[in-house]
Amino acid sequence: MKIYLASSNKHKKREMSEIFPEHQIVTPADEGIAFDPEETGETFLANSLIKARALHLITGQPVIADDSGISVDALGGVPGVWSSRYAGPQFHRGRPDGEKIAQEEQNAMLIGELNEAIASGRLDLAAGKKQGLYRNGLRSAHYTCAMVLLTGVNEYAAAVQTMEGTLLGDVKEARGEGGFGYDPIFFLPQYGRTAAELSADEKNAISHRGKAARMIRAMVGGL
């Protein structure tokens, strides 16, 4: 079955093709479809539904959409749903002029903002742990993925999953050629590697997106 992916990100297409090998995963770009919906949601799930519904209205076919991002405990969950637009401490939700920031620069700014928060001495590790934060120390961070498989405007299966880790202390320590986004600075203590250093199979097994996709598969196994 042909399933449209509401993204032109080639890395996401590869991941979804590996998780749904029995289906043909097609992006808007593959078929020359202009697709750039405005993501106005305040949650990952809201944004994934915005994208899925927008592409379904164009194609009339099943659509997979996800919205993902990284949240840093010590920064109150920043950048969260604005991860792709994050532009430093002054522009958590993106620059007012809409200018895109290179990923390497975003990585450096996020590490810098966290380092400044830690250096300020205002963070309370014990209190944070009581709130379920800092499971991996003051540098704790997690990825979230909200994924939907939409077959009608109001007919969809949804799953939300996370992957926990820490941020590296210096952008110069960023490493790994796999993955994308903040993966080169997202360290996984249990693996001793960044998310970008994992093989595709390793990442799909533990990542927020891989876990969400498998939940979707289980929900709609008969599709």
PLM regions with names:
Residues 2-4, 11-223:
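Anionic-ligand binding patches
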